[in-house]
């Protein structure tokens, strides 16, 4: 389904009944790599606008909420717990900083919930254990916060298959995470996608499935926004892999 609006660089996706919510980053000035490091970072912060889009089942834009402040403008993968959307917005560079917002999907009221001294690219609300799990740039590190945002754990991610881009809570303390690994085979660049079932207590991947499908633009189908659900006995995967003039792809099995 073509989306009937400028999507910029999509990041995360949630479906609520017949509506969709999607985060995206609009870069107005791209970060520039620094060598040597600039102010302790490997690149400049750049500039941009964070978006939380709401659109309907026909791809028509209903709302566009701007998120972030100053150099914090990069929304990531996000979660919905039946009441609120939990959306991280970070600087567009590793080892930086982020704000996690609690957003009412009806009123679009956005309240800063948590400040983190790192780039947070995804958040899951673990309702079974009454806590939040986040991941940093490339999902190399997991963070665990209590119900009020108090830090509880910081753990290296043992999963080396793909960098998680978008994760969502599943009942009984699990999460499904989609992501991509950008590889070079010989001299050929390759995007290898994947889906992982994550145990939110141990933070280990219970199962991981490679996803080799590519869009006509050459992007892995799990490159960024991923939404997985069961629909009338079928497993449904919905993804938005491409930038700017994007298409929502739907795959069903079962």
Region spans (language model):
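A short beta-strand motif characteristic of beta-propeller blades
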Residues: 1-3, 60-68, 109-114, 150-157, ...
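Beta-strand-rich domains and repeat architectures in extracellular enzymes and scaffolds
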Residues: 2-41, 74-77, 245
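Repeated scaffold domains used in trafficking and secretory/extracellular systems
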Residues: 7-12, 70-79, 116-127, 160-169, ...
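Short coil/turn segments that connect the beta-strands within blades of beta-propeller domains
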Residues: 17-19, 82-83, 128-130, 172-174, ...
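Short, conserved, GDST-rich strand-edge loop motifs in beta-rich repeat architectures
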Residues: 23-47, 90-94, 179-193, 247-251
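Beta-propeller blade signature
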Residues: 37-58, 98-106, 190-203, 250-254
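Loop/turn-rich, solvent-exposed surfaces of beta-rich toroidal or solenoidal domains
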Residues: 159-204
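Blade-level signature of beta-propeller repeat domains, shared across WD40, Kelch, NHL, RCC1
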Residues: 221-254
């Amino acid at each position: 389904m073509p989306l009937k609006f400028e999507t910029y660089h999509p990041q995360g996706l949630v479906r609520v009944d017949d509506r969709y919510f999607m985060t995206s980053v609009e870069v107005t000035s791209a970060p520039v790599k620094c060598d040597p490091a600039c102010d302790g970072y490997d690149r400049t912060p750049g500039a941009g606008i964070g978006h939380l889009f709401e659109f309907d089942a026909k791809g028509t834009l209903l709302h566009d909420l701007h998120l972030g402040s100053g150099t914090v403008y990069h929304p990531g993968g996000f979660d919905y717990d039946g009441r609120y959307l939990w959306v991280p917005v970070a600087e567009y560079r590793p080892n930086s900083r982020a704000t996690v917002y609690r957003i009412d999907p009806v009123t679009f009221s956005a309240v800063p919930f948590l400040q983190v001294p790192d780039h947070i690219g995804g958040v899951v609300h673990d309702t079974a254990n009454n806590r939040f799990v986040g991941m940093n740039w490339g999902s190399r590190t997991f963070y665990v916060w209590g119900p009020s945002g108090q830090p509880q754990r910081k753990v290296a991610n043992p999963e080396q298959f793909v960098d998680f881009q978008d994760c969502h809570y599943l009942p009984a303390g699990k999460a499904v995470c989609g992501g991509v690994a950008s590889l070079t085979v010989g001299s050929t660049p390759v995007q290898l996608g994947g889906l992982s079932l994550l145990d939110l207590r141990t933070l280990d991947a219970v199962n991981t499935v490679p996803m080799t499908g590519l869009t006509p633009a050459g992007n892995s189908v799990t490159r960024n926004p991923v939404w997985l659900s069961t629909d009338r006995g079928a497993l449904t995967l919905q993804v938005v892999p491409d930038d700017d003039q994007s298409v929502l792809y739907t795959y069903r099995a079962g």
